[in-house]
């Protein structure tokens, strides 16, 4: 077992999607150049639909929430208050595992956190993400640039689930979306973030420290 990798943890309150994306790109460049440690960002977004590389505008059914094309994999999803977003800026160079293993670790993180609250999460052959029964509770989308990952996962804590009705989530018509709150689990954002950081440390063999 290698020594744990030091990772800086950054918490943001509610961040505009475009601002968060631009910050990721800047930090990825710094990581690539050896000027910054790998970084874990935990935040919530203002309401936005994000379209991955396989998405089309036809996947967005509502016009009252902004839609942004992104460079991540996947199709379309919703981000907004009550949903924990975790961006993982992780240098893959020198690693034995590639992008698929990285995505699998993100999924394991989510399932570990859900299990702590007595919720059984599972993978689905339809694509990356985690489901509870037939309802999706977490989405995952990743891009690698200059050997460093960006984007990551979103876990529905207590968002307005009606906003998911304005899209065809991840291209899957008719499949429901759920949240911890809808499953009867009441958890604060702060507590959920702490659980997610701990799960990240275990799944990625990392040692996290909080940015001031």
From Swiss-Prot:
<protein>
    <recommendedName>
        <fullName>Octanoyltransferase</fullName>
        <ecNumber>2.3.1.181</ecNumber>
    </recommendedName>
</protein>
<comment type="similarity">
    <text>Belongs to the LipB family.</text>
</comment>
<feature type="domain" description="BPL/LPL catalytic">
    <location>
        <begin position="34"/>
        <end position="208"/>
    </location>
</feature>
<keyword id="KW-0012">Acyltransferase</keyword>
<comment type="pathway">
    <text>Protein modification; protein lipoylation via endogenous pathway; protein N(6)-(lipoyl)lysine from octanoyl-[acyl-carrier-protein]: step 1/2.</text>
</comment>
<dbReference type="InterPro" id="IPR020605">
    <property type="entry name" value="Octanoyltransferase_CS"/>
</dbReference>
<dbReference type="InterPro" id="IPR000544">
    <property type="entry name" value="Octanoyltransferase"/>
</dbReference>
<dbReference type="GO" id="GO:0005737">
    <property type="term" value="C:cytoplasm"/>
</dbReference>
<dbReference type="GO" id="GO:0036211">
    <property type="term" value="P:protein modification process"/>
</dbReference>
<dbReference type="InterPro" id="IPR004143">
    <property type="entry name" value="BPL_LPL_catalytic"/>
</dbReference>
<keyword id="KW-0963">Cytoplasm</keyword>
<feature type="active site" description="Acyl-thioester intermediate">
    <location>
        <position position="170"/>
    </location>
</feature>
<feature type="site" description="Lowers pKa of active site Cys">
    <location>
        <position position="136"/>
    </location>
</feature>
<dbReference type="Pfam" id="PF21948">
    <property type="entry name" value="LplA-B_cat"/>
</dbReference>
<feature type="binding site">
    <location>
        <begin position="152"/>
        <end position="154"/>
    </location>
    <ligand>
        <name>substrate</name>
    </ligand>
</feature>
<feature type="binding site">
    <location>
        <begin position="139"/>
        <end position="141"/>
    </location>
    <ligand>
        <name>substrate</name>
    </ligand>
</feature>
<dbReference type="GO" id="GO:0033819">
    <property type="term" value="F:lipoyl(octanoyl) transferase activity"/>
</dbReference>
<comment type="function">
    <text>Catalyzes the transfer of endogenously produced octanoic acid from octanoyl-acyl-carrier-protein onto the lipoyl domains of lipoate-dependent enzymes. Lipoyl-ACP can also act as a substrate although octanoyl-ACP is likely to be the physiological substrate.</text>
</comment>
<keyword id="KW-0808">Transferase</keyword>
<dbReference type="InterPro" id="IPR045864">
    <property type="entry name" value="aa-tRNA-synth_II/BPL/LPL"/>
</dbReference>
<feature type="binding site">
    <location>
        <begin position="72"/>
        <end position="79"/>
    </location>
    <ligand>
        <name>substrate</name>
    </ligand>
</feature>
